[in-house]
C-alpha cells in the first residue's frame, strides 16, 4: 500500500555467535512486533554464506517507531551489535508506487 514503511535488514552473524540464543531472541522479537499496532509482516531469507535478509512491513512511520523504540527491541539491538553481528545495514523505505497485487492462472 502507498505510504507503507518497509525495513530491509541485511545482516551477517559472527562465526562465534550462539545460534540458539540468536534464534530465541528472534522468536521473542517476533512475539513483540506481531502484537504492535500497524505491524503487517516479516519475512527472512538466509544465503549459503550466512548473510540474512529480513523484510519488515509496517502500515506507517508511527508503527515503525513503536517497534524501533520498544525497550526489549532496543536492548536486543544492542546485544545484536555486541554479540551476534559481524556486519550489516538497515534500510528504511517508504512505498511510493505499487503495482498489483496480481495473480496468474
List the model feature ranges, each with a label:
Residues 1-52, 61-69, 86-105:
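Short S/T/G/P-rich N-terminal loop/turn motif that feeds into the first structured element of a domain
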Residues 77, 81-85, 89:
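C-terminal end-helix/capping segment
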Residues 25, 76-77:
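Alpha-helical structural motif
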Amino acid at each position: 500500500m502507498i505510504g507503507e514503511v518497509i525495513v530491509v535488514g541485511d545482516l551477517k552473524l559472527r562465526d562465534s555467535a550462539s545460534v540458539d540464543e540468536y534464534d530465541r531472541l528472534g522468536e521473542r522479537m517476533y512475539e513483540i512486533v506481531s502484537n504492535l499496532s500497524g505491524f503487517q509482516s516479516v519475512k527472512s531469507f538466509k544465503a549459503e554464506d550466512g548473510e540474512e535478509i529480513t523484510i519488515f512491513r509496517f502500515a506507517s512511520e508511527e508503527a515503525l517507531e513503536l517497534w524501533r523504540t520498544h525497550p526489549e527491541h532496543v536492548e536486543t539491538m544492542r546485544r545484536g551489535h555486541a554479540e551476534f553481528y559481524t556486519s550489516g545495514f538497515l534500510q528504511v523505505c517508504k512505498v511510493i508506487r505499487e503495482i498489483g497485487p496480481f495473480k496468474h492462472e
